[in-house]
């Protein structure tokens, strides 16, 4: 391109990037602190791109000229930054004082929630085997494996604790991004904090806020159905962001962190389809990689720069159709930790509406459960894709948590569903599998590949009666928040499943410590309460 025009600084500019450029340069907050390469750039417009012939913009208080002619845009004083640079700048420039009260409150809520869920999974399927296997990967006592009393190298702790947070489908979720942002982020951040003393509660809260922003910005950018497992892939970038913030890395170093993390990014939907225990392990692999990526960048290893949007970048290869502009425009304005939802029930989020509807049916009981002929869920393609799998007579827990028929049958039996219903003889209960035959799912006409709502539950009786319930917003989502009482009840219940028993006093002290996290001088105080 340089030979064609006589210009040296030339880059292809798609419709999407043209639009994103204009969105960025009109964002005054962004321009106050531009993480840009200040030079003249000459950007080729690819076929179909359009732009006004002339605009006068103000960049950092100085007028800047932008011309479009003969299929080229001439940008003076400002060039379109890579998304990795924008995200890295957000990480390094955010201070605890920048966080609104709501972001701090929700960061505390989901830190406590994630600790509880992680502790409970110390007795879940696969946890013991993973801990045993990890003993062959090197020795060290950097960090705690939650709920066990065992100490291991920091990278191993990040892997195992991330597995434990996600392996029971009880961890918090960002519905719009279709990912579980804390599952990778908190274990990596806590492992780093244990390895390096002096990480304060304020540091942790800030790291959580920016880490969730990074993973969810990537998640909401996707306009395609899941193929790679986003809680692991995008979640890994969020974990890397959080650790980089705690490590005090520079903007340039964090750009490298993203590139190095991408080189290690892994996780597909195949284990989800099969109900394999490897599904949550993928979350762990990326949490471990986050620590390694930050260590490598801190040691001076440079990574690729155009990690997300490049010709072989993450979004292009792993997400298909995408648009980063809306998410990037929200950085520093709308904190995504405040958009995270609780999991009130231990199942895939796509099954939580079914559970709520069945519990409501049980409380109203318009006709006896013994008279139910069928129970149909009609909803967006995503919930069918995630939970419309056939029941099996002896499923493992990972399969059962993502099987609407199994989930629904358990709720009909017990008017609730808990962690215990995915363990031992509960998985092979013949009555459960008989009731599972009542359930089916049907796709509606929703065109959004990432939508979970609305969906409808229709229960029909043998005599022709019909009961309907429609879910417009998931229980415990931002518009239907879980009460503090229910939040703490969930945490206390989770602690009761710990492999190493926790006394009630320690549980209550941990609640208080997280409530007062901004006053904690070293977050290892939280770990001390878990041992």
Where do the language-model regions lie?
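Structural helix-adjacent loops and short alpha-helical linkers that scaffold large soluble proteins
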Residues: 196-205, 248-255, 303-306
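Short, charged, amphipathic alpha-helices and their helix-cap/turn boundaries
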Residues: 150-169, 203-218, 253-265, 316-317
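Amphipathic alpha-helical interface segments
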Residues: 185-187, 191, 230-246, 256-326
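Active-site nucleophile and cofactor-binding loops and adjacent substrate-binding regions
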Residues: 177-183, 203-208, 224-236, 279-285, ...
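Terminal-appendage/accessory-domain detector
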Residues: 75-178, 278-288, 295-531
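Hydrophobic alpha-helical hairpins/lids featuring a short glycine-rich hinge
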Residues: 168-218
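Short, Lys/Arg-enriched N-terminal segments with co-localized hydrophobic residues
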Residues: 60-79
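A cross-taxon signal for low-complexity, glycine/charged-rich
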Residues: 3-10, 14-19, 25-26, 34-38, ...
């Amino acid at each position: 391109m340089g030979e064609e025009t006589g210009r040296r600084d030339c880059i292809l500019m798609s419709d999407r990037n043209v639009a994103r450029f204009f969105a960025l340069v009109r964002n005054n907050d962004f321009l106050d602190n531009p993480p840009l390469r200040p030079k003249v750039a000459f950007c080729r417009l690819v076929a179909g791109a359009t732009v006004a012939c002339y605009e006068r913009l103000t960049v950092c208080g100085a007028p800047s000229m932008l011309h479009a002619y003969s299929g080229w845009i001439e940008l003076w004083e400002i060039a379109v930054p890579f998304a990795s640079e924008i995200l890295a700048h957000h990480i390094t420039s955010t201070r605890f004082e920048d966080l609104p009260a709501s972001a701090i409150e929700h960061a505390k809520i989901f830190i406590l929630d994630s600790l509880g869920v992680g502790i409970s999974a110390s007795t879940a399927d696969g946890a013991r085997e993973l801990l045993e296997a990890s003993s062959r990967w090197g020795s060290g006592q950097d960090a705690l494996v939650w709920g066990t009393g065992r100490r291991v190298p920091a990278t191993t702790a990040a892997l195992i604790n991330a597995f434990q947070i996600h392996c029971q489908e009880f961890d918090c979720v960002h519905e719009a991004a279709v990912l579980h942002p804390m599952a990778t982020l908190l274990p990596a951040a806590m492992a780093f904090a244990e390895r390096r003393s002096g990480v304060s509660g304020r540091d942790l809260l800030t790291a959580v806020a920016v880490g969730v922003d990074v993973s969810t910005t990537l998640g909401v950018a996707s306009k395609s159905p899941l193929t790679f497992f986003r809680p692991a892939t995008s979640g890994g970038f969020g974990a890397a962001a959080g650790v980089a913030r705690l490590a005090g890395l520079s903007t340039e170093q964090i750009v490298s962190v993203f590139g190095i993390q991408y080189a290690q990014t892994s996780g597909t939907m195949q284990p989800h389809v099969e109900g394999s225990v490897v599904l949550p392990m993928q979350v762990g692999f990326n949490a471990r990689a986050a620590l390694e990526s930050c260590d490598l960048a801190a040691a001076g290893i440079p990574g690729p720069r155009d990690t997300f949007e490049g010709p072989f970048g993450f979004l292009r290869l792993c997400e298909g159709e995408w648009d980063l502009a809306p998410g990037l425009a929200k950085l520093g304005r709308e904190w995504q930790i405040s958009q995270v939802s609780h999991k009130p029930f231990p199942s895939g989020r796509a099954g939580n509406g079914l559970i709520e509807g069945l519990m409501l049916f049980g409380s109203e009981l318009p006709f006896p459960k013994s008279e139910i002929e069928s129970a149909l869920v009609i909803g967006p393609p995503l919930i069918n894709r995630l939970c419309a799998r056939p029941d099996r007579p002896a499923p493992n827990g990972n399969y059962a948590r993502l099987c609407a028929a199994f989930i629904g049958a358990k709720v009909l039996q017990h008017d609730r569903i808990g962690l215990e219903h995915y363990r031992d003889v509960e998985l092979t209960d013949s009555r459960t599998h008989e009731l599972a035959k009542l359930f089916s799912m049907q796709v509606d006409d929703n065109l959004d590949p990432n939508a979970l709502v609305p969906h409808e539950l229709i229960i029909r009786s043998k005599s022709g009666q019909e009961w309907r319930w429609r879910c417009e917003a998931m229980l415990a989502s931002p518009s239907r928040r879980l009460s503090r009482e229910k939040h703490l009840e969930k945490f206390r219940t989770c602690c009761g499943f710990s492999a190493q028993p926790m006394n009630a006093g320690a549980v209550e002290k941990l609640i208080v410590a997280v409530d007062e996290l901004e006053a904690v001088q070293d977050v290892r105080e939280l770990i001390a309460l878990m041992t």
